[in-house]
């Protein structure tokens, strides 16, 4: 399968551009949403078969997990594992990423709703505080997580679940990155937060700026680096995780 490359704003646009599908694989669905003002997003619900995560790019988001609502600012992260009740709303103009891992039919649900049809996917309406305990939920303010330092890079683990490993990489100029490689058991993808890192995908080298997205499906050769001169930050998403977060720990010990 060919790699996916979306420059800023690109992807499958729905609801007049308010939601853009960046990735739609069996293993994960990633959307980028823009809420122009404070408004409701999703009422309390849970997913039986997948985790639901959020990363705020701009503005403010209020995320309910179990029976507790937390306010997320740019750079903050939240994750509701399987069967944990959650919902969200924007508190101002807000732009954020939403990760469903595995996809759970979320992308097709959005397409159906965009056509005016009922839709439906792995989602069950529920009261706050019902369902599985929220003790396994993840909340990290901007910059927080498990910080692992390596040569010319810092990797901050935001989520390390069976369904997904989500890492925020800070890449100094000169970060060489891994050699081109493939995965035979998961999708590896990247969202550029800052700078202009370089990606190798489908035998091409691309310098991509903030707001760009790259996905390497199973069997797709890929790599990433930061030739500089600026520092770069990227979100790296492995779905399923296949223990990538544990391998990072080993490399950093």
Language model: regions and residue ranges:
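Glycine- and acidic-residue-biased ligand/ion/polar-headgroup-sensing regions
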Residues: 49-61, 66, 185-197, 202
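A hydrophobic/aromatic-rich effector-binding and dimerization subdomain
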Residues: 91, 98-132, 236-237, 241-252
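Conserved short histidine dyad/triad with adjacent acidic residue
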Residues: 31-47, 150-152, 167-183
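Short histidine-centered beta-strand/loop micro-motifs
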Residues: 21-24, 42-48, 89-90, 157-159, ...
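A short, N-terminal "cap"/entry segment at the start of jelly-roll beta-barrel domains
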Residues: 1-29, 114-165, 173, 253
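Short acidic-glycine-tyrosine-enriched beta hairpin
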Residues: 5-6, 67-83, 203-219
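Ligand-binding loop in jelly-roll beta-barrel domains
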Residues: 26, 82-107, 218-244
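A cytosolic small-molecule/anion-sensing beta-strand core signal
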Residues: 57-58, 73-74, 92, 193-194, ...
């Amino acid at each position: 399968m060919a790699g996916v490359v979306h420059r800023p704003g690109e992807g499958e646009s729905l609801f007049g551009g308010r939601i853009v599908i960046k990735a739609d694989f069996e293993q994960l669905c990633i959307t980028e949403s823009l809420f122009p003002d404070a408004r409701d997003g999703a009422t309390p619900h849970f997913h039986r078969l997948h985790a639901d995560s959020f990363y705020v790019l701009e503005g403010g988001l209020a995320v309910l997990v179990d029976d507790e609502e937390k306010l997320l600012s740019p750079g903050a992260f939240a994750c509701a594992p399987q069967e944990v009740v959650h919902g969200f709303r924007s508190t101002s103009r807000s732009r954020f990423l939403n990760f469903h891992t595995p996809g759970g039919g979320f992308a097709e649900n959005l397409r159906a709703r965009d056509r005016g049809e009922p839709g439906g996917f792995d989602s069950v309406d529920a009261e706050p505080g019902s369902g599985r305990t929220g003790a396994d939920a993840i909340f990290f303010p901007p910059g927080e997580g498990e910080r692992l330092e390596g040569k010319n890079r810092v990797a901050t683990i935001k989520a390390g679940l069976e369904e997904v490993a989500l890492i925020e990489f800070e890449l100094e100029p000169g970060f060489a990155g891994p050699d081109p490689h493939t995965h035979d058991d998961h999708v590896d993808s990247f969202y550029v937060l800052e700078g202009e890192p370089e990606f190798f995908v489908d035998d091409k080298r691309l310098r991509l700026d903030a707001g760009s997205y790259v996905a390497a499906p199973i069997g797709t050769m890929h790599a990433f680096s930061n030739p500089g001169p600026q520092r770069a930050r990227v979100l790296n998403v492995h779905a399923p995780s296949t223990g990538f977060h544990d391998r990072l720990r080993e490399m950093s010990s």
